[in-house]
From Swiss-Prot:
<dbReference type="InterPro" id="IPR051035">
    <property type="entry name" value="Mito_inheritance_9"/>
</dbReference>
<keyword id="KW-0809">Transit peptide</keyword>
<dbReference type="InterPro" id="IPR011009">
    <property type="entry name" value="Kinase-like_dom_sf"/>
</dbReference>
<comment type="similarity">
    <text>Belongs to the AIM9 family.</text>
</comment>
<keyword id="KW-0496">Mitochondrion</keyword>
<feature type="transit peptide" description="Mitochondrion">
    <location>
        <begin position="1"/>
        <end position="40"/>
    </location>
</feature>
<dbReference type="GO" id="GO:0005739">
    <property type="term" value="C:mitochondrion"/>
</dbReference>
<protein>
    <recommendedName>
        <fullName>Altered inheritance of mitochondria protein 9, mitochondrial</fullName>
    </recommendedName>
</protein>
Length: 621
């Protein structure tokens, strides 16, 4: 009987096992919802067996609109035979490396003819172990352990008692975007481990398109056994009796802050994202050092700063071809720290223009109206206009502003959900997708602690007659207090580790970068309104900021008419009402699969003639 490694967690999962046979190798695929499992048998040699397809299909959720199309984008069918060949190839390489390379050397990445790239320093015998003579590496069991926003993760168990992780990105973007993302992510993980001393899963090899033996873009890496740090994170836990923060709460913040401190320890000579030198070659241009002072000859020239791979520059940009997109991606000089803000606005405006043109030509299936796209264009162009004026490198009002403007490594998923802690207590930072190099003053707080609501530092002192309030009101204030506390713990940890950078969390500095952060964190089409809101708030305080030396220009670069401000206020209120009144608006219509199926059974979700689903709120209890 096959048991799924994730069934006991109560989530949808899939496992697949290969049984050795002198004649054939049948595959046993297990899919389960909660604790129930079904077995499906298929021949390993039959790649076209439809029974196998279920193992590759997306299953962790459904969409109210365009469900079939969204799931089709997330199919991760790959060649099991090709994967087996790749595994045997890296083991063969390890034998050759043992004869030709000293174990303390760090060879350059090996770009192979079959379009996979191996990292030789991770594929030595000390890393992989050995295979018995005349034995081949075989995958004997596979489990789908995660279906994320951008990629799917499989665990591979082999006949040599070693497990691997296979990561396959969803085909949500154009091929050239996925290619750049993978190249940059692997290079950034390599840099984080070799140069910053951060524990990351060893990457053995990767392929950036479907022309390799796996027939999908992929990353093959080390499997890390342990527990997610998120298991120790309870953001709404009560303080201890002495009013000090809970020990587990503080421990999680400090562990994540330790990782951030290592990421921030290096100052770079440019702005963009990291790549291996061979992955970003510019003929005729002199190679620039990524950072100063490298003495290890194996690391000299290993990496280069290339176009940014930050998510805001590629997310939902499929209407822009490679040439159109590349104009906005950099890399940029360290002497132009605000170019990244300007180009964030420009690329979003260009994307909105292209989407609008398709909509006007009746050639777009998107469920977005022309008015929204037109107003997006104005918002993003306004951001591009304001961007270069946000910070003055010569100000003395912001302490250590020159340090804040220096490019440093930014990790968008610095989160307990992205950290595994081994049994020995060693934390590993997992997913580096979308990492970039940009001024620290433009880094936003990690989502697990970020809080921009009303600040409450002491319930008794900050809330008049707190003890007289009814329980429901107390609960609201307690929520605000705990969110304030968590953000304060994070800021305090930054101050302890990098006190020269603490000015970045000062309220005026946060307000100055807020339009940019709203653009970076935008998830839906309507959230351009949050960019507008931040730009309008800046307009209201710009004169005060100028008089106090925070900004260089006396006049705010934008003007807003009374009619514009009134329309914005109405639109913003309507947006918030939409979030409240329309279930699942905040997740863009995505619903976890177990909940989706239960809502259908309860008659709350009803399928319409166009295959979309409607929420029948009248059926809610």
């Amino acid at each position: 009987m096959i048991r799924s490694t994730t069934a006991k967690l109560g989530k949808r999962c899939a496992t697949l096992r290969v049984r050795a046979s002198p004649i054939l190798r049948p595959l046993v695929a297990t899919r389960c919802i909660t604790n129930k499992a079904d077995e499906v048998f298929t021949k390993l040699s039959d790649e076209n067996d439809p029974k196998r397809d279920a193992f590759f299909n997306y299953s962790w959720g459904s969409w109210l609109v365009n469900d079939k199309q969204e799931k089709a984008k997330r199919v991760t069918k790959f060649s099991l035979e090709g994967l087996t060949d790749v595994l045997n190839e890296i083991y063969a390489d390890s034998q050759q490396l043992a004869k030709t390379v000293k174990s303390n050397r760090i060879p350059a990445p090996n770009h192979k003819k079959n379009l996979i790239v191996t990292l030789p320093h991770n594929t030595m015998i000390k890393d992989l172990g050995t295979v018995n003579p005349n034995e081949k590496v075989r995958v004997i069991r596979m489990a789908s352990i995660h279906e994320g926003k951008h990629h799917r993760i499989y665990k591979l168990d082999t006949n040599i008692d070693r497990s691997f992780v296979l990561r396959i990105p969803y085909a949500l973007e154009n091929g050239h975007v996925i290619e750049s993302r993978l190249k940059s992510e692997v290079a950034t993980m390599d840099f984080a481990h070799l140069k910053l001393g951060i524990n990351v899963p060893k990457v053995y090899c990767y392929g950036v398109n479907a022309l390799n033996p796996v027939r999908q873009p992929f990353v093959l890496e080390e499997f890390i056994e342990g527990k997610l740090l998120m298991r120790d994170w309870n953001p709404l836990v009560d303080d201890k009796k002495d009013s000090l923060p809970d020990d587990n709460l503080k421990s999680v913040v400090e562990q994540v802050s330790d990782l951030q401190s290592k990421l921030l320890s290096m100052q770079f000579n440019g702005i963009g994202s990291l790549y291996f030198s061979k992955d970003y070659e510019r003929p005729g241009e002199p190679k620039k050092s990524v950072y100063d002072g490298e003495s290890n000859p194996d690391l000299q020239g290993r990496w280069i700063i290339g176009p940014t791979a930050e998510r805001v520059f590629w997310r939902k940009k499929s209407v822009l071809n490679k040439e159109a997109l590349s104009k906005f991606l950099g890399p940029w000089s360290a002497n132009e720290p605000l170019e990244v803000v300007k180009n964030t606005g420009l690329v979003e405006a260009e994307n909105a223009k292209a989407r609008l043109a398709l909509k006007q030509a009746d050639a777009s299936p998107e469920a977005v109206d022309e008015t929204t796209l037109s107003e997006q264009i104005v918002s993003f162009e306004n951001l591009a206009t304001v961007g270069p004026h946000l910070f003055d490198s010569g100000t003395t009002t912001i302490p250590n502003v020159k340090e804040l403007l220096k490019p440093r490594l930014y990790h968008p998923d610095l989160d307990p959900m992205n950290i595994i802690v081994t049994a020995e207590g060693t934390p590993y930072l997992l997913d580096f997708e979308g990492s970039s190099v940009k001024p620290f003053i433009l880094h936003n707080s990690p989502q697990f602690v970020a809080y921009d609501g009303p600040k409450i530092f002491d319930l008794q002192e900050d809330i008049p007659d707190y003890e007289k309030l009814v329980d429901s009101e107390k609960a609201q204030y307690e929520f605000m207090y705990k969110r304030t506390r968590n953000q304060f713990l994070w800021d305090s940890a930054l101050n302890e580790r990098n006190n020269k950078l603490i000015s970045a969390v000062a309220p005026p500095v946060k307000l100055l970068r807020s339009p940019y952060i709203a653009a970076v964190e935008r998830k839906s089409d309507d959230e351009y309104l949050l960019i507008d809101e931040a730009l309008i708030q800046l307009a209201e305080v710009w004169e005060v900021f100028y008089k106090n030396g925070l900004v260089k220009d006396a006049n705010y670069p934008l003007t807003f008419s009374k009619e514009t401000l009134e329309k914005h206020a109405n639109d913003l209120n309507a947006f918030h009402e939409k979030l409240i009144s329309r279930p699942f608006a905040a997740t863009q219509g995505w619903i976890p699969q177990d909940m989706f199926e239960n809502l259908i059974k309860a008659g709350i979700l009803v399928k319409e003639s166009d295959s979309s689903y409607t929420v029948k709120t009248e059926n809610l209890d």
